[in-house]
Amino acid sequence: MKILIKSWLFFLILFVWGCSMNKQITKIDSMQSIDYQLPVEYTTIDKDMKLAYTEMGKGSETLLFIHGLGSYIPSWKKNLESLQKKYHCIAIDLPGYGKSSKGNYSVSMDFFAETILKFCEQKHLDKVVLVGHSMGGQIAMATALKYPQLVKKIVLIAPAGFETFNKGEKQWFRDAMSV
């Protein structure tokens, strides 16, 4: 009985303490207002597509980091800080994500692979090492298959496969990831 009373008392104290936390949650108006704590640059791909990216390190080999679904540049922060000592590191926000342009993009692997190609052409990059996590791994694979001349190596971190999504699933992802 004492254990039961002590347990209830513990949970009651925990509940009251949790309810008394007066932490304000700041509403984010847009991704532009988020401080990445990394230098952010922009480049325009095609007409109205602006890509956000961060670039650091001076190594001779370029690592191009591609985030996963629902992610953005800061997910690579610790990797960038460490790897910039030896490599030229670039992390991008894919179209529709983070600080990059939002639009009615096709969100297919071919679209993202072509975006990676155009970004690399603009930056005069060739023989890059594509580093992709989750959907970014899927994009890295698609890019390497479609544009092998661009890619030296790929590094896959818990990559997605080559799933296909129906129209409703694609719309759900768009709605869920839009701010």
PLM features per residue range, with description:
Residues 138-146, 152-179:
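Flexible "cap/lid" loop of the alpha/beta hydrolase fold
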Residues 2-61, 86-87, 125-126:
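Alpha/beta-hydrolase fold catalytic core
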Residues 49, 55-99:
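Conserved HGGG/HGGXW glycine-rich cap/lid loop of the alpha/beta-hydrolase fold
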